[in-house]
Amino acid sequence: MSGSIKVTLAKSMIGRPEKHRKVLRAMGLTKVNRTVCLQDTPTVQGMIRKVSHLLRVEESADGSE
C-alpha cells in the first residue's frame, strides 16, 4: 500500500456534518475541484472512506506528483 493517491473534492462541503468537514480540511481540501496528492497509508484510506461520497480518487501514475 505504498505510493500516492490523487484526491479531488467533487462535491461541496455545504450542509455536511462537521466531522466530514474536519476530515476534508485535514486532507487539504477546502474548495470544490481542488486536488491534492496524498501518500497511500491506512490513515488516509480511512479518511477517504469517511467522505468517499464527496471525492474523486485516482491512483497517481508515479510518486513524484
UniProtKB/Swiss-Prot annotation:
Subunit structure: Part of the 50S ribosomal subunit.
Protein name: Large ribosomal subunit protein uL30
Domain of life: Bacteria
PANTHER family per record: LARGE RIBOSOMAL SUBUNIT PROTEIN UL30M (PTHR15892:SF2), MITOCHONDRIAL RIBOSOMAL PROTEIN L30 (PTHR15892)
Gene this protein is translated from: rpmD
Family stated for the protein in its record: Belongs to the universal ribosomal protein uL30 family.
InterPro entries named among the record's database cross-references: Ribo_uL30_ferredoxin-like_sf (IPR036919), Ribosomal_uL30_bac-type (IPR005996), Ribosomal_uL30_ferredoxin-like (IPR016082)
GO biological process terms on file: translation
